[in-house]
Amino acid sequence: MARMSRRVFTLSALSVLAATGGGAAACGAAAPRSGTAARAAAGRPAPEAGRASRAPAEMRGVWLATVTNRDWPSRPGLTAAAQRGELTAHLDKAVRDRLNTVILQVRPTADALWPSPYEPWSECLTGRQGRNPGWDPLGTAVREAHARGLELHAWFNPYRIALHADPTRLTASHPARRHPDWVVPYDGRLHYNPGLPEVRAFVQRAMLDAVARYPVDAVHFDDYFYPYPVAGQTFDDADAYDRHGGAFGSRAAWRRDNIDRLVREMAAGIERVRPGTRFGISPFGVWRNAATDPRGSDTQAGVQTYDDLHADTRKWVRENWIDYVVPQLYWHIGYADADYAELAAWWAETARGTRTHLYLGEALYKAGAAEEPSAWQDPVELSRHLTLAAAHPQVRGHVFFAGKEVAADPIGAMARVVADHYERSAKPPR
């Protein structure tokens, strides 16, 4: 969570973050919540954390990334029939592996995999941004997933505009070209400025259009809020800070508040547009290192979401702002800088006593990859993750990155997970 350090998650970004020890908020009164939290607020009890609630229900998910045609479609420009065929093949493979949820990336770069009145058709479909593919991928995905007993979670990236820095390459009608003041170039990419209230309102309208049109089971964000930091570069939001940051003691605090507002307003919008639809986020796996904050994990990660992405993921869980969280724990058991075992325990403790469901993001893409250490050459590594996580009652399941690896399973790591842990089908938690 696409998750990841999701999140998408491009493999190049994941590799850079891994090399640095990484992996791939204060708004006043509580906003209305979607899904589980809304039901609890209405006086209906949320399921208690613990083995009794885990037994009949377990998240078994897969991310299906569309950015750069990572997982689907296999390449741009396929016929509508070929794209449908590839999509249903992914859904069928999920059913065969006794998974129960597909998290489909439907807004990878400020574009759309449905006929949006706000943003252009995604170039991953036809190779040309704005070109109608001749069918409705998101509508079809929801219908075909539900026909197979799968949940379909719509995965959106809120602020990424493009994986390049040239606005003229965007289709002429793109909102970023109509509002160049909304755009911040950074790290060779284009980003919407999270510090502008008009940007935050716009991206919510664009995303909620899909929720209004289709009975998606959940809305899903990945790990990209403010962009991952790049040495020697500055994300230029000084003008927005001068206009809107006066109430904050630092730009970092203001930025965290901007992301907090996005999360809370989106939760309220989902509940307003389609009540009962859940809202989940898949952050980078380290909130803060304990050396930075005693509440943090015993890790030495090069990226900390609170400080670097300005995403206070711990608070979102502790204060029940979201229905589920899927931290991207894309490291092996025993990894010195970010041990999977340490982080699984830290997130379990963070979720303890909350209504936020905890699922763990799993780096299936690393299994058998030549550049990965020996732990990832063992097809049993991921199965060990699930065995270890079962000792924490707060862990209600796992999501695998990503669809291409579920389909190919080069060293049999997914097959081992299925054989060891997914002998019978399971419904996703509600």
PLM regions and their residue ranges:
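N-terminal export signals
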Residues: 2, 7-30
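Aromatic-lined substrate-binding rim segments of carbohydrate-active enzymes
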Residues: 108-156, 251-266, 273
